[in-house]
Amino acid sequence: MEKYQYITLREKPELMDKAAAWFNSKWGVPKEAYLECMEAYLKQETELGWFLCLDGDQIVGGLGVIENDFHDRPDLTPNVWAVYTEESHRCQGIAGKLLNLAVEDLRAKGISPAYLVTDHTSFYERYGWEFLCMVQGDGEPDMTRMYVHK
């Protein structure tokens, strides 16, 4: 039996408020912004989903998929964003499994490639992501790295 449970928010919609608060606490994006995206996903208004890793009833990892992760290249869509694993649960493959689940989910829906904005180097390459180009983040002074998963 797997130590952790990996789910989409559609599998446990009752976690929406808790998940929005969790993502807000990690990234500082308003909880309402997460709720709006999550509600659209749960109402089947979008196929761009939310993926969580649970340790018992605690969220220990998660990510979402949205149209645009606040950058100047709207043609590079959809974007995996808000990738986070609790420090106490890192180095166990949680983020990698969540990334793979998101890419597999998108492919199953006929959506490919997927994109991701990050300042990290080398981490995402382990999971099949390739550096594509530099993009300008909304309100950001410096360019940031855009990756693609084909």
Where are the regions a protein language model picked out?
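Conserved active-site alpha-helix within GNAT-family acetyltransferase domains
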Residues: A108, S112, T118-D142
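Conserved acetyl-CoA-binding loop-helix of GNAT-fold acetyltransferases
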Residues: T85, C91-E104, L116
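Conserved beta-strand in the GNAT
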Residues: W50-L52, Q58-N68, N79, Y84
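Short amphipathic alpha-helix that is part of the acyltransferase structural core
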Residues: M1-C37, W50, L54
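Short loop/turn motifs at secondary-structure junctions and domain boundaries
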Residues: Y41-E47
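Helix-adjacent hinge/juxtasegments
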Residues: D69-T77, W81-A82, E87, Q92-I94
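Active-site beta-strand termini and strand-to-loop segments that position acidic
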Residues: L54-G56, H149-K150
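Short hydrophobic/aromatic beta-strand or adjacent loop that forms the aromatic wall/cage
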Residues: L48, P141-M146
